[in-house]
């Protein structure tokens, strides 16, 4: 693995292959009007490599370069259950839904070594170059992640929707999507890192839950001998605003940054399929 493929051919001499173990168990039910699937999963990633970065500042606190901390031996454990169903109680009504409940967390601590923007080993966060990669003066930190929730993805999601068929060729549907148990991704910065020391993370900021309604409609018809379908979609019908992901370093919303909000509804252009 190259340390900085854009500017250097230096490779990570301690890089190892990532390993994945996964197991699933599922059950399905089928009837004339109802289909249900239930699934349980367990996945473990081992020896992941992760990189976080920040600015190297001069004496006036102006950025002069970028540093990265290359962490090895990072494990993660994802487990949960998933349920989905499709019901058609009448020929003109279809109801569908899903529920996913997960428990995802980092499962190990990691040691990270520092490099500058050119992939050179750093002796400190002031930009001093170390004598060699993994030399005694090569700056490193231990990052304690074990038990910290994995961020940037909701661990509890649900959806419920209904589609109505009416007249001849018309179809309209409304779906609600719900997101919860979403955590901000952990962050490293120069003020919180101690070269040669330990950086301990607690549970990151838990992002408030959110959801939105989406509307869709279609009409099937013929143009001569050709079959055509006219589609239309309106996402986030009621202009709900909620946080999708964020980054923080201390587990509080006050210091969260990189926050991304769901936007006001987007109406997709009408499409004609022939």
Locations of regions flagged by a protein language model:
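Structural signature of outer-membrane beta-barrel domains
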Residues: 1, 32-34, 43-47, 102-106, ...
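Solvent-exposed loop segments that connect transmembrane elements
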Residues: 1-12, 50-70, 107-146, 184-203, ...
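Residues on the lipid-exposed face of transmembrane beta-strands in outer-membrane beta-barrel proteins
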Residues: 25-29, 81-87, 97, 160-164, ...
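Repeated loop/turn-to-beta-strand initiation elements of outer-membrane beta-barrel proteins
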Residues: 33-36, 92-95, 168-172, 223-228
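C-terminal beta-signal and adjacent terminal beta-strands/loops
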Residues: 177-191, 219-263, 267, 271
